Amino acid sequence: MGIVLKKGQKVDLTKGNASLKKVIIGLGWDVNKYDGGHDFDLDAVAFCCGEDGKVHNEADMIFYNNLKHSSGAVEHLGDNLTGDGDGDDEQILIDLSSIPQHINKIDFTVTIHEAEERKQNFGQVSNSYVRVVNSDTKEELIKYDLGEDFSIETAIVVAELYRNGSEWKFNAIGSGFEGGLAALCKNFGLNV
């Protein structure tokens, strides 16, 4: 088992681990059982940002409709429509050695699909986590449990990978947003 982080903690990912080239960002959650008439569909989204914290264009947003960055460095491994089952619900593969120089950080977020229409929010989601796994060895390097701090939010910035010189660090963020995917897009410089 790797390092367990709390909200706001940062840790070196590649410093002292020069052989680490590919990691899997695993995101998981459970939906509290309630009869709202609709299934929950949570979606992982990665925003590949420049120094200003914004994406350059829509191609820097990796999600169920754009599964792979043009550089090949960031790849969403598929949309889980129900969140059922144990383990990671969605995964994003990161090739650290292929990330273009203009990308200084990658923010990992989770949104609830059609949250407003379905009257759903993160207060109805539990056991949320993000973890970083060495893609080659399958060793879990880092885990951050988000806890139960959310109520009316429909989107969360879970964590980020960011450049620190020639190294990569991981930051446990856990910041909630109202307004779902549209609010996140605006936050990262996209107009939808």
From Swiss-Prot:
InterPro entries: Stress/Tellurium_Resist, TerD. It comes from the Bacteria. It holds the Pfam family TerD. Not known; could confer methyl methane sulfonate (MMS), mitomycin C (MC), and UV resistance. Belongs to the CAPAB/TerDEXZ family. This is Chemical-damaging agent resistance protein C. The lineage of its organism: Bacteria, Bacillati, Bacillota, Clostridia, Eubacteriales.
